[in-house]
UniProtKB/Swiss-Prot annotation:
Keyword Transferase belongs to the record: no
TM region positions: 10-27
Protein name as annotated: Small toxic protein ZorO
Functional summary from the UniProt entry: Toxic component of a type I toxin-antitoxin (TA) system. Expression in the absence of its cognate antitoxin (small sRNA orzO) leads to cell stasis and a decrease in colony-forming units. Repression of ZorO toxicity requires base pairing between zorO mRNA and sRNA OrzO, as well as RNase III (rnc), suggesting the mRNA is degraded. Base pairing occurs between 18 bases in the 5' UTR of zorO mRNA and the 5' end of OrzO sRNA. sRNA OrzP, which differs only in 4 of these 18 bases, does not repress ZorO toxicity.
Organism name: Escherichia coli O157:H7
Record carries keyword Transmembrane helix: yes
One GO CC term on file: plasma membrane
Inducing factors: Expressed during exponential growth in rich medium and at lower levels in exponential and stationary phase in minimal medium (zorO mRNA cannot be distinguished from zorP mRNA by these assays as they are practically identical). Translation of this mRNA is repressed by secondary structures in its 5' UTR and partially by OrzO sRNA. Processing of the 5' UTR increases its translation in vitro and comparative toxicity in vivo.
Amino acid sequence: MDTLTQKLTVLIAVLELLVALLRLIDLLK
């Protein structure tokens, strides 16, 4: 696995975490 693919995978994982956090915050309101 080259570094570009690795960076993309990490980026997607971080974005998914952010979306999940936003959904949680939205539910807690």
